Amino acid sequence: MNKKFKKIVTEKKLTDAERIKENSNYLRGTITDDLKNEITNGFTGDNFSLIRFHGMYQQDDRDLRIERNEQKLEPRYAMMLRCRLPGGVIKAKKWLKIDYFASKYTLYGTIRLTNRQTFQFHGILKKNLKDVHKMLHSIGLDSLATANDVNRNVLCTSNPMESLIHQEAYEWARKISNFLLPHTKAYAEIWLDQKKIVTTEKEPILGKTYLPRKFKTTVVIPPYNDVDLYANDMNFVAITKNEKIIGFNILIGGGLSFIHGNKNTWPFLATEIGYISVENTLSIAKAIVTTQRDWGNRTDRANAKTRYTINNFGLNEFKKEIEKRANVNLKPVREYSFISRGDRFGWIKDINNNWSLTLFIQNGRIYDDNDKLFKSGLLKIANIHDGNFRITSNQNIIISEVSEKNKNKIEKIALSSGLINKSTNLRKNSMACVSFPTCPLAMAEAERMLSFFITQLENIMLKYGVEDEVIILRVSGCPNGCGRSLLAEIGLIGKSIGRYNLYIGGNRIGNRIPKIYKENITEQEILIHLKYLIKTWSNERKNKEDFGDFIVRKEFVKEVINPVYDFWS
């Protein structure tokens, strides 16, 4: 361990987030008191942060802020709740209750699929929170540890029934998720009214003050990188033999968030550290998490994530500590490669001769509006489907394990409700975070602007004869990275209302960070620049060259090789 760095860190004052965790009594705080408080619809003091460990964020409708302020009213507080759903798999019949709750108990009546393979509700009033937790519990689900300084929802390559390997990988995602969960009984006591029976508690893996920052994990089956592994803290890349997983390549330290203007923050790709046999999976997971727990920076949250810890101590030192704690020697990385990270839309036959139908859900927003009857369509499918729904890391949904007798019925519903539609490859490979009106961190629109923006970009691509090509396009309303714009070929990151930084030069498979091309420009200015770039790409690319590769080859931006030094240069 770098003793000099350790001394500097320990001499600094811990962040207030650390005080909150230390004093929380294992995430209880005074949340139960706030639930009884009818004067405000929000949570107060430390509880505002603590509810995140229970899977909720306090938000307000930013479209109404000024109006409510003028009326001397508090903001329209409501909670966003995110379900824990490792691998994104849920029984179709369970969807019936999820749909019912969204319709009856949320302000917006929608369900949002996320790029972390789960769903979330927006607009839950405080008085309805216990109802949603009890509803989730009744169908075997919860929202524990889907936010704040813990291991978040574990991702897994989609459609695990496509092969025995997919099913095995999904089971590992579940095992890792359960293994790294907080042990506190606070969630059950507060939301499910279970009596406290344990007088002393311990968190053997996460510790009393949990992790320094959020921590994200994936399980990946090459050649598909649909989970965007390079954006995650801890990754298990499956190595197989005879249709069985025999081990994992381990990659650590990925992450995309940064702060505008703060050159001490930067995105970073997860880095290979070695190979393990499958029986060492949980011990390695524990070693990585506890090393980050103990070595991570608790004095500066902007530099608290795993990638900064590795940068501070050095990759070799971090790796040695993992091996020491796990009592495992990491072997050389085994060969693997990726060919894409998009979803495969349409029907696919699985290992049991059943069918899976992958549906494109733009921005993951499930709602009903005019010809888009996504919500009622999925409800109709859930009523007749005996299998699963599988949420993908691209915010789409797979109707899986469809029997031959139900295949035509489900297809008819999907067609009539607009769930099967003719979308361009550009649109199908786009993504946006939620942003306005509910995200308190949003600087610019994302989800609400994306569809119209894509339509204009589609017209440009049509004009230059590349309308069928794939370009990875992503929009984030702020630099926190939720929309994964910094793994896109074209990435927009909000700077202020109507203005974005334009990043270009990422690649198709998601292992190159794009670089800023233009700063603080409007949507129309972005389209002007992209029109020129797409025209040039159409005329000068070599051998069906991807857009991002062309951008780097022609040096419209310099390739980001080590973002610690060249992301900002």
UniProtKB/Swiss-Prot annotation:
Binds 1 siroheme per subunit. Binds 1 [4Fe-4S] cluster per subunit. GO terms for molecular function: 4 iron, 4 sulfur cluster binding; heme binding; metal ion binding; NADP binding; sulfite reductase (ferredoxin) activity; sulfite reductase (NADPH) activity. InterPro entries: CysI, NiRdtase/SiRdtase_haem-b_fer, Nit/Sulf_reduc_fer-like_dom_sf, NO2/SO3_Rdtase_4Fe4S_dom, NO2/SO3_Rdtase_4Fe4S_prot, NO2/SO3_Rdtase_4Fe4S_sf, NO2/SO3_Rdtase_FeS/sirohaem_BS. Siroheme binds at C482. Pathway: Sulfur metabolism; hydrogen sulfide biosynthesis; hydrogen sulfide from sulfite (NADPH route): step 1/1. Gene3D superfamilies: Sulfite Reductase Hemoprotein, domain 1. Keywords: 4Fe-4S, Amino-acid biosynthesis, Cysteine biosynthesis, Heme, Iron, Iron-sulfur, Metal-binding, NADP, Oxidoreductase. GO terms for biological process: cysteine biosynthetic process; hydrogen sulfide biosynthetic process; sulfate assimilation. One of its GO terms (cellular component) is sulfite reductase complex (NADPH). Transmembrane segments: none annotated. It comes from the Bacteria. Its EC number is 1.8.1.2. [4Fe-4S] cluster binds at C433, C439, C478, C482. Its cofactor is siroheme; [4Fe-4S] cluster. It catalyses: hydrogen sulfide + 3 NADP(+) + 3 H2O = sulfite + 3 NADPH + 4 H(+). It holds the Pfam family NIR_SIR_ferr. Alpha(8)-beta(8). The alpha component is a flavoprotein, the beta component is a hemoprotein. Component of the sulfite reductase complex that catalyzes the 6-electron reduction of sulfite to sulfide. This is one of several activities required for the biosynthesis of L-cysteine from sulfate. Belongs to the nitrite and sulfite reductase 4Fe-4S domain family. This is Sulfite reductase [NADPH] hemoprotein beta-component. The gene is cysI.
